[in-house]
């Protein structure tokens, strides 16, 4: 079973909230790869209130400055709205993390590209990702980075960024490991139409460069089959792809 890795190795963060990142040109052949993931949105949505509790608490709403001696305190931050469009892309990104744990997507593009792909407009965006934490409380505590210096508080700055007005959270489970995503944005039109939390098991089709499919293992349901001349039998095969 995978374990939660030390934060310096586990987490990455995007600092360029307002930067327009051009779509990456990739000549590699892209193929679909299907993976079966278990969604955990009931648990994932618990983080929403935790974010707003930190944003509106005068004691908690702070970050270190680069000198690690003085703090920026965020007074009168607005609560974020929960955006169900952002949740949709956060859950897809969480599934992608099971293939490639990075802000870059398995198809070779930046995470920003999923906004265009899903037709979601925004003026600013940021993303927090994590893996290995079993509960909403545990991953939120890691993202808060209370005890980290300035260089280790990128996720915290995302959570407290006054330029964001909404968030969506994604959580999936695969092969004994939990994957979590927070998608932050500033949007002029926030989708607050509530949907039922998805806790089902579903097959996701993800785009991957063909060159990243590095192996194929096929397993039979039996080690041997005994047949007489003219007889037939049903053989069950299980195929497993190795990606990245």
Regions found by a protein language model. Give the residues of each.
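Short, well-ordered surface patches within globular domains
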Residues: 28-118, 156, 162-167
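Bacterial N-terminal signal peptides
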Residues: 9-20
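Proline/serine/threonine-rich low-complexity linkers at boundaries of modular beta-sandwich domains
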Residues: 203-217
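Bacterial N-terminal signal peptides that target proteins for export
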Residues: 1-9
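Surface-exposed, proline-enriched loop/turn segments that connect beta strands in immunoglobulin-like
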Residues: 220-223
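Sec-dependent signal peptide cleavage junction
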Residues: 18-29
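A well-ordered secondary-structure block
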Residues: 92-96, 102, 108-190
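Short, solvent-exposed loop/linker segments at the N-terminal edge
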Residues: 225-232
């Amino acid at each position: 079973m995978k374990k939660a890795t030390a934060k310096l190795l586990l987490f990455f963060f995007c600092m360029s909230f307002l930067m327009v990142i051009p779509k990456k040109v990739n000549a590699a052949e892209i193929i679909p790869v299907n993976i079966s993931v278990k969604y955990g949105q009931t648990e994932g949505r618990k983080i929403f209130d935790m974010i707003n509790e930190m944003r509106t608490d005068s004691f908690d709403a702070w970050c270190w400055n680069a000198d690690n001696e003085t703090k920026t305190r965020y007074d009168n931050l607005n609560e974020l709205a929960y955006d169900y469009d952002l949740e949709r892309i956060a859950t897809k990104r969480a599934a992608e993390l099971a293939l490639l744990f990075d802000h870059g997507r398995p198809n070779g593009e930046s995470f920003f590209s999923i906004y265009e792909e899903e037709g979601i407009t925004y003026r600013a965006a940021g993303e927090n990702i994590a893996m290995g934490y079993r509960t909403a409380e545990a991953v939120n505590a890691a993202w808060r980075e209370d005890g980290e210096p300035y260089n280790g508080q990128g996720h915290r700055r995302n959570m407290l960024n006054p330029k964001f007005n909404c968030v969506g959270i994604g959580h999936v489970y695969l092969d004994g490991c939990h994957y979590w995503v927070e998608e932050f944005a500033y949007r002029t039109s926030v989708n607050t139409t509530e949907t039922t939390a998805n806790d089902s098991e579903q097959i996701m089709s993800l785009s991957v460069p063909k060159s990243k499919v590095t192996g194929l293992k096929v397993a039979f349901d039996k080690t041997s089959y005994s047949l007489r001349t003219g007889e037939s039998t049903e053989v069950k095969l299980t195929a497993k792809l190795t990606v990245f």
